[in-house]
From Swiss-Prot:
It comes from the Bacteria. Disulfide bonds: none annotated. It catalyses: a hydroperoxide + [thioredoxin]-dithiol = an alcohol + [thioredoxin]-disulfide + H2O. Belongs to the peroxiredoxin family. Tpx subfamily. The lineage of its organism: Bacteria, Bacillati, Bacillota, Bacilli, Lactobacillales. The keyword Plastid does not apply. Homodimer. Keywords: Antioxidant, Oxidoreductase, Peroxidase, Redox-active center. This is Thiol peroxidase.
Length: 50
């Protein structure tokens, strides 16, 4: 069972496998700039999710 701060968490959807295409998403940089996965199109990427 996966927990977050001691509380159970339920995931939905299918788990990505190595080689799968990730859906586009966006995050905010420390400089408060919005960056999306599409901003890095054509470049090799490593996604580390914790």
């Amino acid at each position: 069972m996966t927990t977050f701060l001691g509380n159970p968490v339920t995931f939905t959807g299918s788990q990505l496998q190595v080689g799968d295409t990730a859906h586009d998403f966006s995050l905010t940089t420390p400089n408060l700039e919005k960056k999306s996965l599409a901003d890095f199109a054509g470049k090799k990427k490593v996604l580390s999710v914790i």
